[in-house]
């Protein structure tokens, strides 16, 4: 039979139980025993959900308290000295300190002396974030975290057939960074492999037959030294007990296909959603003894699978492989919401088009059954339902809109170009804005308090009238403006109290989007996002932000930034359509945002920020495909931004990003000011400016908003001095790394006091 399995399952829970438990624990409202009980209950529920869906081999080790890469760092004892316990093995407090920075806890204790958090960055080209391992030249590895073995025991006690999931040694090293002296982290491989050996020995002793080893870097452009290291590593790993399935996903193997096919392991998983073209070659080149796991159901989207189309390929594979064929989602279902059945308010038509993690498991299991029992009545009924749904979706009037198509067809190159070059624009902007040297600002959002969330919820439930809700939001805006005035910030924001999410807020006001109530996915730690779903052609029926920003500007003589989310980020942080290209969807969004930008300018707003936090996230994993993406992504931004006069200043913001290799394309966006995340990486991003003279203004973030830790002004001033060595003072801005939505007011004000003080200190020093 064709075995069905899952590469991983969402860990947050159908109702975000893990998020709530983590935050209660961090506030001192839930002790460690209570937190662990929630985790154990969720794991049991998730295994049962997958088993009930028909999955034969369940993943174990996909659960993590914060992040799976961080869990591996603890397992391997890769703990930076600033977090290392004085005695004994690491604890959950150690893990959370590494993730969030070390702060005093609510019960009065503290960990790690106020150490700053580890760097966080995007997991390949997804919107999930992982904690970057920090390696030292004298790095030693030791098995120091028992979580995987405890969870295998839990699953076995519940009677499940399990497949532990490990991040492979090459991918783990690739994801990390060297700290301190000059060395190559690949040289650490031989020290790391014995720990993997110990893990396999322990798992074999627990009765484990198969282990999934995730090596997604096999879909990247790998240096030859890393390719050689794969052969070296797996020649050693093959000696260890347990059968081993190498899992690749997020792209095609391409030039690494021969390497992956011939590694001395027992099976290989490939992603045929992202890279269907690799199927014939891998089928021909896979050794006759190996299992081939085909990722046929999209683990990163919410659309139902085209069962008939997928089954056609699987039948061919089944004829060739027989019992060596396994069926799976394309990747871990971490990137999918948990269960569509929780959605009790979606219209029936849209709901029939969707599938979340539970339903994707059902699809995987159905495909396996269809190979073994094609005439089974339940299989035939499911295939017929799939046909009906796809036909209905293709014919639906909510998808195609002639007026949007007409606007797209009318786009010309001049529509994506400002009136004058930056040098001319900036002179007019400086005359208009009259800002000091090193102007201070924030990225946009201020803390979303419980009062704000309650007001929004009450308004949605009809408990507050529109007028009452507007006044509640006006009060929040007044507070935000007053705080900023008192702090002495130079360019203000209205705080975004009225916005539930930087994408969903706009998506709710655009035609072509749909929304779920429980479509949450994990972004990092306890942070969950609920991506909107792009269903059809996109357009803006009316202004979205103008009245809020006008109100805020009326409260101050200082410039008030209009705050918008850019077309690429709107696309990347939504679940996109599958029937048209990302480029087309980005252009539709750009036209909608362009209309809003023009309306803000007409309302007297002199600075408009178009956030492109996800710009680099959209970059293809293979460099050969970069330029095509960068061309349409930069054009979409310019299309959104270029409808204004020269004296209107366009800002953009990008976060969690390594831009050294795409700095020219960022310059091609031609934003007047760009603010970027740099503090966690100690201004490492600014190395790009040593070889590329970035022409416009830039605000490198001077403190990390993802941690509750408040850095002092001296620390921020130190980062500014580093920045000033690479960026001319007259083009340097001072700002946090990102928006302040997830922080509390006391730490927000404390950090901004220090930030303004640092800017004033640098003005005095360097002016």
From Swiss-Prot:
Enzyme class name: transferase
Q: What does the entry list as the binding residues for 5-methyltetrahydropteroyltri-L-glutamate?
A: 16-19, 122, 527-528, 573, 617
Which Gene3D superfamilies does the entry link to? 3.20.20.210
What's noted on cofactor binding? Binds 1 zinc ion per subunit.
* Cofactor requirements of the protein: Zn(2+)
Q: Which residues are the active-site ones?
A: 706
In what pathway does it function?
Amino-acid biosynthesis; L-methionine biosynthesis via de novo pathway; L-methionine from L-homocysteine (MetE route): step 1/1
Q: Which InterPro entries match?
A: Cbl-indep_Met_Synth_N, Cobalamin-indep_Met_synthase, Met_Synth_C/arc, UROD/MetE-like_sf
From which domain of life does this come?
A: Bacteria
Protein EC = 2.1.1.14
Q: Which Gene Ontology molecular-function terms are recorded?
A: 5-methyltetrahydropteroyltriglutamate-homocysteine S-methyltransferase activity; zinc ion binding
Print the keywords alphabetically: Amino-acid biosynthesis, Metal-binding, Methionine biosynthesis, Methyltransferase, Repeat, Transferase, Zinc
Instruction: Say what the protein does.
Output: Catalyzes the transfer of a methyl group from 5-methyltetrahydrofolate to homocysteine resulting in methionine formation.
Protein name from the UniProt record: 5-methyltetrahydropteroyltriglutamate--homocysteine methyltransferase
- Lineage, please? Bacteria, Pseudomonadati, Pseudomonadota, Gammaproteobacteria, Pseudomonadales
């Amino acid at each position: 039979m064709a075995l069905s399995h899952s590469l991983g399952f969402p860990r947050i829970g159908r109702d975000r139980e893990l998020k709530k438990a983590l935050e209660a624990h961090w506030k001192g409202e839930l002790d460690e025993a209570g937190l662990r009980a929630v985790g154990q209950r969720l794991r049991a529920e998730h295994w049962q959900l997958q088993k009930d869906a028909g999955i034969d081999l369940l993943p174990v080790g996909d659960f993590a308290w914060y992040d799976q890469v961080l869990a591996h760092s603890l397992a391997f004892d890769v703990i930076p000295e600033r977090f290392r316990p004085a005695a004994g093995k690491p604890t959950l407090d150690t893990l959370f300190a590494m993730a969030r920075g070390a702060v005093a806890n609510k019960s009065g204790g503290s960990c790690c002396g106020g150490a700053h958090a580890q760097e966080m960055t995007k997991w390949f080209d997804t919107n999930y974030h992982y904690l970057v391992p920090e390696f030292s030249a004298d790095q030693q590895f030791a098995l120091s975290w028992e979580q995987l073995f405890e969870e295998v025991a839990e699953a076995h006690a519940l009677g499940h057939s399990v497949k532990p999931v490990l991040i492979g040694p090459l991918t783990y090293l690739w994801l990390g960074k060297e700290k301190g002296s000059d060395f190559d982290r690949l040289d650490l491989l031989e020290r790391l492999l014995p720990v993997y050996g110990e893990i396999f020995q322990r798992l074999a002793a627990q009765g484990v037959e198969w282990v999934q080893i995730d090596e997604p870097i096999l879909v990247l452009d790998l240096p030859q030294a890393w390719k050689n290291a794969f052969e070296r590593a797996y020649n050693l790993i093959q000696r260890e007990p347990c059968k081993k399935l190498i899992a690749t996903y997020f792209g095609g193997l391409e030039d690494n296909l021969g390497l992956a096919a011939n590694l001395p392991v027992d099976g290989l998983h490939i992603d045929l959603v992202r890279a269907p073209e690799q199927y014939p070659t891998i089928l021909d080149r896979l050794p006759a003894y190996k299992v081939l796991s085909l990722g046929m159901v999209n683990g990163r989207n919410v659309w139902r699978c085209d069962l008939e189309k997928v089954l056609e390929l699987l039948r061919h594979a089944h004829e060739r492989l027989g019992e060596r064929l396994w069926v799976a989602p394309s990747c871990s279902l971490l990137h999918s919401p948990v269960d569509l059945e929780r959605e009790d308010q979606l219209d029936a038509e849209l709901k029939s088009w969707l599938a979340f993690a539970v339903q994707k498991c059902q699809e995987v299991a159905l495909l396996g059954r269809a190979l073994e029992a094609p005439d089974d009545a339940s299989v035939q009924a499911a295939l017929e339902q799939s046909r009906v749904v796809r036909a209905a979706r293709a014919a639906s009037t909510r998808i195609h809109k002639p007026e949007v198509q007409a606007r797209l067809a009318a786009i010309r190159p001049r529509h994506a170009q400002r009136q004058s070059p930056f040098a001319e624009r900036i002179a007019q902007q400086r005359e208009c804005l009259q800002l000091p040297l090193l102007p201070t600002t924030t990225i946009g959002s201020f803390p979303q308090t419980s009062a704000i969330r309650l007001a929004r919820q009450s308004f949605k439930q009809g408990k507050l009238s529109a007028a009452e809700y507007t006044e509640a939001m006006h009060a929040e805006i007044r507070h935000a403006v007053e705080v900023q005035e008192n702090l002495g910030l130079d360019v203000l924001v209205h705080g975004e109290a009225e916005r539930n999410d930087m994408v969903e807020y706009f998506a709710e006001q655009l035609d072509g989007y749909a929304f779920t109530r429980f479509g949450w996915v994990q972004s990092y730690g306890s942070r969950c996002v609920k991506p909107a779903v792009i269903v059809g052609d996109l357009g803006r029926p009316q202004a979205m932000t103008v009245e809020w920003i006008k109100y805020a500007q009326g409260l101050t003589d200082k410039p008030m930034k209009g705050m918008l989310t850019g077309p690429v980020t709107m696309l990347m942080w939504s679940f996109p359509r599958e029937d048209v290209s990302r480029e087309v969807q980005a252009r539709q969004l750009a036209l909608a945002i362009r209309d809003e930008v023009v309306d803000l300018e007409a309302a007297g707003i002199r600075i408009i920020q178009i956030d492109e936090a996800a710009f680099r996230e959209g970059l293809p994993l293979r460099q050969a495909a970069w330029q095509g993406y960068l061309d349409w992504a930069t054009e979409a931004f310019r299309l959104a931004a270029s409808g204004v006069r020269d004296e209107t200043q366009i800002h953009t913001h990008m976060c969690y990003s390594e831009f050294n290799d795409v700095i020219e394309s960022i310059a091609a966006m031609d934003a007047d000011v760009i603010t970027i995340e740099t503090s966690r990486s100690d201004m490492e991003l600014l190395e790009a400016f040593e070889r590329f003279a970035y022409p416009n203004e830039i605000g490198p973030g001077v403190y990390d908003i993802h941690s509750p830790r408040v850095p002092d002004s001296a620390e921020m001033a130190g980062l500014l001095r580093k920045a000033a060595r690479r960026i001319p003072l007259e083009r340097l801005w001072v700002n946090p790394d990102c928006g302040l939505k997830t922080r509390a007011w006391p730490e927000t004000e404390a950090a901004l006091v220090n930030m303004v003080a640092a800017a004033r200190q640098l003005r005095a020093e360097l002016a």
